[in-house]
């Protein structure tokens, strides 16, 4: 059937996105110039709301395309300038290098990470202990590595194990699609598969929350952490210590929540690994171990040594984070024999789309700065007493981060806090406390929905999610106990423990305040 050019354009525009979504984006593109001609301020806020909409609808269409169109139009109609965007990108180069090189570097260490999570899954029989181990392992890894990569590894383990059992249970071997359950005629096998799905769902959610618990602690745990650390002129250890009054109690309560939901089988947790599934997986792992060559074993040892280098280099701030990631790429690929250009190129596939999206974030940030969009909000917050400022920043960040991407939210608020410092509206001490409130408020409540955490969104959009019946609603439900506990404990710590604990660490000379002019000159 022949279609018109109009129909062809409608099909091509934003690909497989729903028709209503395409119409909405076109309406935004038409309305924005009209509103801008009447009021640049309201047009700017409209753009921010539209951009948050594209982030919230990430499952309908990846936000790079619709968000990029909105940002491109904003430049054309004069809401910001290419020079301003270039300045924001240049100022955040370290973050871009983190996403490009660190994520790619960890890609080449996947064998080691797969080995670790596989041994955890098969050697720990208690589901409670296993859940705690997955949560703790994900938290530790996310404190030094990108959370997206950690979740990608856990997904790889889960897909592999699901495929092994599904092929054996269906009796069709590798020719049967993992989504095809038609050959599972035995009710016992079907029941075991359903239980296995629930088991994998709970482990993946524990690991996902673990990435948030660990990722909030360090400057490399999440991209926005690095932006906040750069503005405050904090290095790895100082960032870790300044966050500790909030992140350590939240971490402990998060681990306690993990125990309770498993112990009492709440919110979809508590499913055990069926015995027949465990036996099949153990047999497969035994065969894999026996067939592992000395070359394979040496690769694992090399990756472990490079992991030690990575942690040490980050802890002692031996170089910029992105450059440390590049060193990981060079060391692992050269010592493990990965020299094919196409194999190396695959390592960058996960990070580059998000890197491009982050650049679009910076375009929207440029609009916010040029149009002074957050000035009324910041003035409202700054008119409050200093202790209430921390609470309001935490709550505003948390609310937005639960429905929008936390990198975008964190970037916007730390820019506004930095502007308040430079104008003399707040003191250096208050700015540093606000930076902690912004970082924790951005990271902790964002586990509420997949929109806030890139790792959660990656899990939801992965090929594994439909196999284990992990829907958007189920993900929100399973994250609910963690959301409530982490958000409330974080808020209480910001109100009651942050300032006295920071003062105590200063008295112990664990923290030192840099000269105000140094902080001002080192920001973005």
From Swiss-Prot:
Name this polypeptide is given: Na(+)/H(+) antiporter NhaB
Function: Na(+)/H(+) antiporter that extrudes sodium in exchange for external protons.
Superkingdom of this protein's organism: Bacteria
GO CC terms: plasma membrane
Stored PANTHER family: NA(+)_H(+) ANTIPORTER NHAB, TRANSPORTER ARSB-RELATED
Pfam families: NhaB
InterPro entries: Na+/H+_antiporter_NhaB
Encoding gene per record: nhaB
Protein's membrane topology: Multi-pass membrane protein
Reaction(s) this enzyme catalyzes, per UniProt: 2 Na(+)(in) + 3 H(+)(out) = 2 Na(+)(out) + 3 H(+)(in)
Keyword terms, alphabetized: Antiport, Cell inner membrane, Cell membrane, Ion transport, Membrane, Sodium, Sodium transport, Transmembrane, Transmembrane helix, Transport
Cysteine-cysteine disulfides: none
């Amino acid at each position: 059937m022949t279609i018109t050019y109009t129909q062809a354009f409608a099909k091509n525009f934003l690909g497989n996105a729903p028709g209503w979504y395409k119409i909405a984006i076109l309406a935004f593109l038409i309305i924005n110039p009209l509103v801008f001609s009447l009021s640049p301020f309201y047009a700017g806020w409209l753009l921010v709301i539209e951009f948050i909409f594209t982030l919230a609808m990430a499952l309908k269409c990846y936000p790079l395309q619709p968000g990029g169109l909105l940002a491109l139009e904003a430049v054309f109609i004069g809401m910001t300038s290419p020079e301003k965007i270039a300045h924001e990108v240049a100022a955040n180069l370290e973050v871009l290098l983190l996403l490009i090189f660190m994520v790619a570097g960890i890609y080449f260490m996947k064998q080691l990470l797969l080995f670790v999570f596989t041994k955890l899954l098969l050697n720990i029989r208690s589901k409670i202990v296993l859940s705690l181990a997955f949560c703790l392992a994900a938290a530790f890894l996310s404190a030094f590595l990108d959370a997206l990569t950690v979740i990608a590894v856990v997904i790889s383990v889960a897909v592999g194990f699901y495929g092994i059992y599904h092929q054996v249970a269906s009796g069709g071997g590798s020719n049967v699609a993992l989504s095809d359950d038609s050959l599972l005629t035995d009710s016992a096998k079907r029941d075991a598969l359903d239980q296995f799905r629930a088991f994998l769902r709970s482990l993946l959610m524990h690991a996902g929350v673990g990435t948030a618990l660990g990722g909030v602690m360090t400057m490399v745990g999440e991209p926005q952490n690095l932006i906040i650390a750069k503005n405050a002129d904090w290095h790895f250890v100082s960032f870790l210590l300044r966050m500790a009054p909030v992140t350590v109690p939240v971490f402990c309560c998060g681990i306690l929540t993990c125990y309770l939901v498993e112990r009492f089988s709440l919110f979809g947790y508590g499913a055990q690994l069926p015995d027949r599934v465990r036996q099949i997986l153990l047999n497969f792992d035994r065969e894999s171990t026996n067939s592992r060559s000395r070359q394979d074993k040496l690769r694992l040892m090399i990756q472990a040594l490079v992991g030690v280098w990575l942690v040490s280099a980050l802890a002692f701030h031996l170089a910029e984070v992105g450059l440390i990631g590049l060193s990981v790429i060079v060391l692992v690929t050269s010592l493990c024999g990965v020299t094919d250009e196409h194999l190396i190129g695959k390592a960058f596939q996960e990070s580059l789309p998000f890197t491009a999206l982050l650049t679009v974030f910076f375009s929207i940030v440029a609009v916010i700065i040029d149009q002074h969009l957050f000035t009324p909000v910041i003035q409202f917050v700054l008119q409050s007493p200093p202790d209430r400022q921390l609470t309001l920043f935490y709550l505003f960040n948390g609310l937005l981060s639960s429905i929008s991407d936390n990198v975008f939210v964190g970037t916007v608020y730390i820019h506004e806090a930095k502007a308040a410092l430079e104008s003399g509206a707040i003191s250096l001490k208050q700015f540093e406390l606000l930076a902690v409130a912004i970082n924790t408020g951005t990271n902790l409540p964002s586990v509420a929905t997949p929109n806030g955490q890139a790792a959660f969104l990656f899990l939801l959009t992965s090929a594994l999610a439909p196999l284990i019946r992990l829907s958007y609603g189920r993900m929100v439900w399973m994250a609910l106990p963690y959301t409530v506990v982490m958000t409330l404990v974080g808020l209480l710590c910001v109100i009651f423990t942050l300032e006295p604990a920071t003062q105590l660490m200063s008295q112990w000379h664990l923290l030192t305040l840099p000269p105000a002019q140094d902080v001002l000159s080192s920001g973005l």
